[in-house]
Amino acid sequence: MAISDEPESVATALNHSSLRRRPSATSTAGLFNSPETTTDSSGDDLAKDSGSDDSINSDDAAVNSQQQNEKQDTDFSVLKFAYRPSVPAHRKVKESPLSSDTIFRQSHAGLFNLCIVVLVAVNSRLIIENLMKYGWLIKSGFWFSSKSLRDWPLFMCCLSLVVFPFAAFIVEKLAQRKCIPEPVVVVLHIIITSTSLFYPVLVILRCDSAFVSGVTLMLFSCVVWLKLVSYAHTNYDMRALTKLVEKGEALLDTLNMDYPYNVSFKSLAYFLVAPTLCYQPSYPRTPYIRKGWLFRQLVKLIIFTGVMGFIIEQYINPIVQNSQHPLKGNLLYATERVLKLSVPNLYVWLCMFYCFFHLWLNILAELLRFGDREFYKDWWNAKTVEDYWRMWNMPVHKWMIRHLYFPCLRHGLPKAAALLIAFLVSALFHELCIAVPCHIFKLWAFGGIMFQVPLVLITNYLQNKFRNSMVGNMIFWFIFSILGQPMCVLLYYHDLMNRKGKLD
């Protein structure tokens, strides 16, 4: 008899025994004497059986009890031979589930659930301890205060930014009709895009506005600038391809053009509100709007926005206010403040990412029936810093690839130079969005982004040397959540407080 890899289970043995077992005399007699098969019963018995439900129920119970007793007897008899002491218990070479060779092939769903339970328990205790020690720190003016009314110039500036897309549309319409030459079109677009970016900067610098209002305006103006550049660059490329087709230098089928060159105000208006930074005359659309799903996302957005406000007011503000400048004073105390700030800062950043990239952009896409909703990838699994920047913000990444990185390569620049230019542009915009609302130009954000370039080289080297290694992922999480962002928060906060102290 061949020995199988696993001992035969009791259930399998029971099934096999039931197939081999012959019917007993009792069961045979019961089968032929049952009321359903008996044909020579007297009419009185039939009348008696049909007239008495209690008698029928008692007979059925007796039959069921007899069958159960037979099954139990059979089970006990099979158990004697199902797993004998002589059956081999060890049949082949096996590794422990947590050994280095098999740990990544095992499912760790239970440990993941344990981490979730521990995380909830620990954070619940910290919240209760914080409330018992400091009380409720959230002020009534957190969401809105009378000081917000002084930011009306920023609000008017935000509304006036729609003028620049309209000006770009007029330029493109004139270029389509060949009323102005191509060099003039390029110069006009440079003027329009530059003005759309520096006009809000001047408004913020001239007004003593709140930090949140300034950041909101700068982010909005940067989005408008990126959209205008994409609009101008895409139409420029489509005009060039159309000229090649008209001259007969290229065939339309070989140019990979999914749509004809057409300047439409409707397509521009849709592009301005769509959750994308890359212009094209048409986009993939969904058939309808899911109203129930949309309502659930709105509820989630409100809840997580409240969670962010709670963490900022209850945790981050007290930690920052009781800290010192990280580059001055006691190094050990500064390190403790950075580490203490890292956890709530990470929670806020994750909530912000979830609220904006998942909830808000999906809500906007659902309202506009925008089909391509790959706004991010699994950046949390990034093994290198380069992978993180390529996956965490897909709208910006697609814009960089389409309008900056590949154009640099087409002009003969090496990949390293194109990558450096991409990080340089990103660093400039990070500095604008933070330094301008703070009225501080210390280049902390610029330096933090440019510091990613050597990290890209280091993590790429480690990934090539240690295949399938998570060393790069650990370095990314440490730099991102433990060192980088908390350090920037403390640097800008103390520089901002020093500036306000000098003004007072």
From Swiss-Prot:
Q: What is its main location?
A: endoplasmic reticulum
Which keywords fit this entry according to its UniProt record?
Acyltransferase, Endoplasmic reticulum, Glycerol metabolism, Lipid biosynthesis, Lipid metabolism, Membrane, Transferase, Transmembrane, Transmembrane helix
Q: Which residues cross the membrane?
A: 108-128, 152-172, 184-204, 209-229, 259-279, 301-321, 348-368, 416-436, 438-458, 471-491
One GO MF annotation is:
diacylglycerol O-acyltransferase activity
According to its UniProt record, which reaction does this protein catalyse?
Answer: an acyl-CoA + a 1,2-diacyl-sn-glycerol = a triacyl-sn-glycerol + CoA
How does the record classify its membrane topology? Answer: Multi-pass membrane protein
Note the InterPro entries from the entry: Diacylglycerol_acylTrfase1, MBOAT_fam, Oat_ACAT_DAG_ARE
One Pfam family, short name: MBOAT
* Catalytic residues in the record: H430
Q: In which tissues is it expressed?
A: Highly expressed in flowers and pods. Expressed at low levels in roots, stems and leaves.
- The segments labelled Disordered in the record are 1-72
What is the annotated localization of this protein? Endoplasmic reticulum membrane
Question: What is its pathway?
Answer: Glycerolipid metabolism; triacylglycerol biosynthesis
Q: Where is the composition biased (Polar residues)?
A: 24-41
Its EC number(s)? 2.3.1.20
**Physiological role:** Major contributors to triacylglycerol (TAG) synthesis and oil accumulation in developing seeds. Catalyzes the acylation of the sn-3 hydroxy group of sn-1,2-diacylglycerol using acyl-CoA. Has a marked preference for oleoyl-CoA and sn-1,2-dioleoylglycerol over vernoloyl-CoA and sn-1,2-divernoloylglycerol.
| Sequence similarity | Belongs to the membrane-bound acyltransferase family. Sterol o-acyltransferase subfamily.
Protein name, please? Diacylglycerol O-acyltransferase 1B
